[in-house]
């Protein structure tokens, strides 16, 4: 290990850190002190030298310290990127190289600064910030996001499942769930005000009342889990299957009925469908279809076939006086 100060120029910095297959000690941590900024304008590649410092794998980058690190070149390293503290700013496409796992610790921030980046898996702790900031983050193998996602831009899930539990109310971009991928959320704050383009699977796990205000489109499937009620309106534009596994899905209200565009709606044994409007496709009922909402004469329109699988249809009637 050789100490590198902020006064080193780029040539000396790259020489001392030994990123590019030189035959000396290598070290993958950038420790930037509070109020200091270090801009790395050279490309970082895997270090194949056997002489690596303190167990460094020669291909991973760690950002520590409360200062700011800027990566302003397209990089080629293939290991993990870990932001332990402070801020890491991207200033080039794929500035994180071909990162395997991206870790954000509590108190750390990654600012994508308008640039695209592809990684394998995202892992963020509560108290961290992922600022998409007009950029595009592509996940090939999902991950777990307990921190905050903010800004605009796009977060694309190409494979695996991304489980979001953080408060993302300041994210106004787009979640894209591609075929074979899965996005799981539990509260309105998990989605922020983002659009969702779903071509895979979206799980909405509501344990309490949730008015879904996000625009959701695509031919992917939507799964409703959790005992809470999910109220949807005309912003629900998906055409894939809707699977009500637990809890209730409420279509619109008396003044604004909703025709759900799903080609297939399945009400499971612990599920319920109610509200005003109908479904464009087939309806399979093993649970409850509740037409008792608010007033006698409520109508549920089914555009396809209705199949009862030991499910109940609840009706509200009125006798003449």
Predicted regions and their residues:
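Extracellular repeat-rich scaffold modules on cell surfaces
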Residues: 10-101, 132-190, 197-265
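Short aromatic-glycine motifs in intrinsically disordered, low-complexity regions
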Residues: 31, 108-114, 203-205, 274-276, ...
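Extracellular beta-strand/loop-rich repeat segments of large surface/secreted proteins
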Residues: 34, 134-137, 222-223, 239, ...
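Extracellular beta-strand-rich solenoid/capping regions of secreted or surface-exposed proteins
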Residues: 62, 125-127, 150, 285, ...
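Acidic, glycine-rich low-complexity segments
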Residues: 106, 115-116, 126, 197, ...
């Amino acid at each position: 290990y050789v100490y590198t100060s902020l006064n080193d120029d780029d040539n000396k910095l790259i020489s001392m850190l030994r990123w590019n297959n030189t035959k000396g000690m290598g070290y993958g941590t950038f420790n930037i002190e509070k109020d200091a900024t270090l801009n790395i304008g050279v490309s970082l590649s895997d270090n194949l030298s056997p002489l690596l410092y303190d167990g460094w794998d020669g291909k991973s980058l760690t950002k520590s310290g409360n200062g700011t690190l800027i990566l302003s070149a397209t990089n080629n390293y293939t290991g993990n990127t870990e932001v332990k503290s402070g801020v890491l700013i991207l200033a080039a496409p794929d500035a994180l190289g071909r990162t395997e796992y991206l870790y954000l610790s509590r108190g750390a921030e990654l600012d994508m600064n308008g640039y695209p980046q592809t990684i394998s898996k995202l892992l963020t702790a509560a108290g961290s910030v992922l600022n998409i900031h007009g950029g595009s983050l592509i996940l090939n193998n999902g991950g777990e996001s307990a921190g905050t996602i903010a800004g605009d831009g796009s977060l694309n899930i190409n494979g695996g499942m991304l489980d979001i539990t953080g408060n993302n109310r300041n994210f106004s971009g787009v979640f894209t769930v591609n075929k074979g991928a899965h996005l799981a959320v539990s509260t309105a704050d998990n989605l922020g005000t983002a659009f969702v383009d779903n071509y895979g699977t979206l799980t909405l796990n509501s344990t309490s009342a949730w008015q879904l205000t996000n625009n959701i489109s695509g031919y992917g499937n939507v799964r409703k889990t959790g005992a809470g009620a999910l109220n949807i309106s005309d912003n629900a534009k998906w055409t894939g299957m809707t699977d009500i596994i637990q809890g209730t899905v409420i279509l619109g209200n008396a003044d604004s009925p909703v025709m759900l565009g799903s080609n297939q709606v399945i009400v499971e044994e612990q599920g319920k469908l109610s509200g005003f409007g109908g479904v464009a496709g087939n309806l399979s009922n093993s649970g409850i279809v509740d037409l008792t909402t608010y007033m006698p004469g409520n109508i549920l329109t089914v555009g396809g076939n209705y199949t009862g699988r030991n499910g109940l249809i609840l009706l509200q009637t009125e006798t003449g006086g």
